[in-house]
Amino acid sequence: MPLSSQPAILIIGGAEDKVHGREILQTFWSRSGGNDAIIGIIPSASREPLLIGERYQTIFSDMGVKELKVLDIRDRAQGDDSGYRLFVEQCTGIFMTGGDQLRLCGLLADTPLMDRIRQRVHNGEISLAGTSAGAAVMGHHMIAGGSSGEWPNRALVDMAVGLGIVPEIVVDQHFHNRNRMARLLSAISTHPELLGLGIDEDTCAMFERDGSVKVIGQGTVSFVDARDMSYTNAALVGANAPLSLHNLRLNILVHGEVYHQVKQRAFPRVT
């Protein structure tokens, strides 16, 4: 099976195009099987799960799919619902909407349903997409909230445990749109082993099974690699003090460009 038709993980910075070209959503639809897709929509992060679930249901229905189901999970007990678990065994794609990432993790983390979704994703059996809050939960370490517009400092970011879909990353969404570079750097200062991803709105980082990450959409994806960081004062200063971070590697990619995790290199678009 060519890479372009294999299941993938799509991490979306929020506010993806839902009306015109719908390129990111079309890519998820295609990677989930196109007209043969069986897609589950998880709107649990939203305060209005029924409304947001129906919105995405309409979008994917218009594209043409084999089956659609909104997994309207509002309490943790539903994470062991036999009907939902059966659907997850049959589906080809799962889409997690935006909202509140803490709410999403509170409902799904360590449930049989989420454990099986993660397992099937890791086995390359299904595609998984998350937008906004649905993107934030992708790592094991998750940015749960914080501020922006300041210098990097530890008080700028609130961390929590995510869903561990791609455990080696930490994600910030609505990135340049909300001036969140300092927030991502603050998170990286205490977790330099992680690859930081700052994803702009209507932009997606698509993780392939060969270790490559392709950028799709209108904005940029910033890759902050601190694995060779030579120094930080994070452990020496107060929570509100400015942070020093030496020898970071920053790559900013646009549509069609690729970052390779293993090679730790960025590649321009092949035309």
Curated annotation (Swiss-Prot):
Listed A to Z, the keywords are: Hydrolase, Protease, Serine protease
The EC number(s) given in the record are 3.4.15.6
Outcome of altering R178A?
100-fold decrease in enzyme activity
Q: Does the keyword Hydrolase apply?
A: yes
Gene Ontology molecular-function annotations: peptidyl-dipeptidase activity; protein homodimerization activity; serine-type peptidase activity
Reactions catalysed according to its record = [L-4-(L-arginin-2-N-yl)aspartate](n) + H2O = [L-4-(L-arginin-2-N-yl)aspartate](n-1) + L-4-(L-arginin-2-N-yl)aspartate
Question: Which segments does the entry list as coiled coil?
Answer: none
Where on the tree of life does the source sit, at the highest rank?
Answer: Bacteria
Task: Please describe how the activity of this protein depends on temperature.
Answer: Optimum temperature is 35 degrees Celsius.
Q: Which GO terms describe its biological process?
A: proteolysis
InterPro entries noted in UniProt: Class_I_gatase-like, Peptidase_S51, Peptidase_S51_cyanophycinase
Look up what happens after changing D100A.
Answer: 2.5-fold decrease in enzyme activity
Give the enzyme's main class according to its UniProt record, as a single word.
hydrolase
Role description: Exopeptidase that catalyzes the hydrolytic cleavage of multi-L-arginyl-poly-L-aspartic acid (cyanophycin; a water-insoluble reserve polymer) into aspartate-arginine dipeptides.
Per UniProt, subunit arrangement is: Homodimer.
What protein name is recorded for this chain? Cyanophycinase
Lineage, top ranks: Bacteria, Bacillati, Cyanobacteriota, Cyanophyceae, Synechococcales
Gene designation per UniProt: cphB
